[in-house]
Amino acid sequence: MRVPSLTLAVACAALLAPAAARHHIAEEPVARREGAVGAADLLAKVRGCAQISRGRYRSDEGAPAAVPVCATRDAVFWKADLDIDCDGRPGPRCNRRTDPLFSAATAFQQSDGRDLSAESLPYIVVPAVSRIWDHGVRGGSVAAVVYRNRVQYAVVGDLGPRGIIGEASYATARGLGINPDPRGGGAASGVTYIVFKDSQVKPIEDHAAAVATGQRLARLFVRGKWPGVRPPTSRRPPAAPRR
C-alpha cells in the first residue's frame, strides 16, 4: 500500500519497484496460466460473497472502505486492486535507492532466517489482525491470485495496515503481467485473491512447492472436493439384532 510502514512486524507499505524495471518487464516470465485450472474456473467459484469480515477494507489510504473479505467452505477471498510490495531482502529492483518507502523487513522469514525477497518470490500481503478480520492466516498459506486470464500462485508473505487490503510482491505483479513499478504500475482493480484454508508451504520461499500445492488445491476447489470433507453418513439407528 502506498502508505508508510507501521512497524517492522507489521511492515506493509505499498512498495515500489524501480522505474528502470519498466524496460525489463517484457523479458520476465509471465504466468498466463500457472497450472491446469484457468482463471475463469476459479472466478466462477467466487462470484458471490458470504462476508466473514466485520467491516470492509480500504484499497488505499483515503479511499472508501468498500472491500469485504468473503469465504467459502474451502477458502477466503477478496477482490481489490494490487499495490506493489517491494519490502524484504534488497535486490537490484527493490532497495532504498529505488523505493523511498523501502523496508528491509517482512513479517515472515525464510527458513534461513533472512527476510523474503519481493522481487523474486511471489507472495501476497494480508492486513494485520484487527476487529475487522481476525483471520488467523499463517505465513506460507497458499494463495491463487487472478487477474484477467492469468493465475499466479503465491504464499502469504507479509502483513499490511489493519484497514487496507490489496497488495502483493513485485514478483507476483510481474507474473500476472502487471507493471511492478508502483510509480506507474500496479492494478487499479480487477484482482482476486483466493487463500486456501489450512494450507501452508514450508519452507515459505519454495515457490515450486507453492505452485504444486496451489494447483492441487485449485483443482479440488473448483471440483468441490476439498480434502478432509467427509461424505454424509446415515444417522439411522442400528438395526435390532435378530433373535
Spans of model-derived segments:
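Bacterial Sec-dependent signal peptides at the C-terminal "C-region" and cleavage site
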Residues: V3-P4, L8-E28
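Soluble periplasmic/extracytoplasmic beta-strand elements of cell-envelope proteins
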Residues: Y123-V125, V155, T192-I194
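Short beta-strand-centered aromatic/proline hotspots
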Residues: Q152-P161
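Short, solvent-exposed secondary-structure boundary/capping segments
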Residues: R162-T172
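Intrinsically disordered, low-complexity linker and terminal regions at domain boundaries
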Residues: G184-T192
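Cell wall/extracellular polymer interaction/catalysis modules
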Residues: R22-R150, G163, G175-R183, K197-T233
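Compositionally biased, proline/threonine/alanine/serine-rich low-complexity intrinsically disordered stretches
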Residues: T233-R243
